[in-house]
Amino acid sequence: SLVRTEATGYGTVYFTQEMMGAHDDRFDGAKVIVSGSGNVAIYAAQKAQELGATVVAMSDSSGYVCTPEGVDIELLKDIKEVRRARLSDYAKETDGVTYHEGGNIWEVEADVALPCATQNELDGEAAIMLADNGCRYVAEGANMPCTPEAIEVFRKRKIFFAPGKAANAGGVATSALEMQQNASRDSCTFDYTD
């Protein structure tokens, strides 16, 4: 089905958008950090920027890039999906981007954090950094990327938190739609599915 590749990342952002809206906030003008640079991360970053956010940092297993003007999603997709290269290559090809080898993306100042890389990537110490830097929203794009200690910090510091069981269910919802389409021998457009 269309949107299968994008579904989990898009869904994470749509869930976060609803969470933000409940508190009179929105993505428009927000600074966002996204850990990871696989499908979930890339498409979460893409959708956040489509909604008016600036994705100021993204990571891979070697480090992270920081880009105050926002990530160039098309170049990032070319580097990660076509060339299968590293974020350090993205930094080399883009003006105004700094690469932090082995750095901790959670030290970057942002309004929204979307951990989309791997399990237990965001611990209590990282959660404190996010809180100290003014982060207000965290939504799990990956499966269980936040440790229990991190979640406790979010609770104590009044950071709105969306667990992956809810926030990253866009892929599951799209799979259900795909099964329905297959059963009825029907198809939906990209825009409808999005």
Region annotations inferred by a language model:
Residues V40-A44, E121-E125, C146-P148, A169-V172:
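Short glycine/serine/threonine-rich phosphate/pyrophosphate-binding segments
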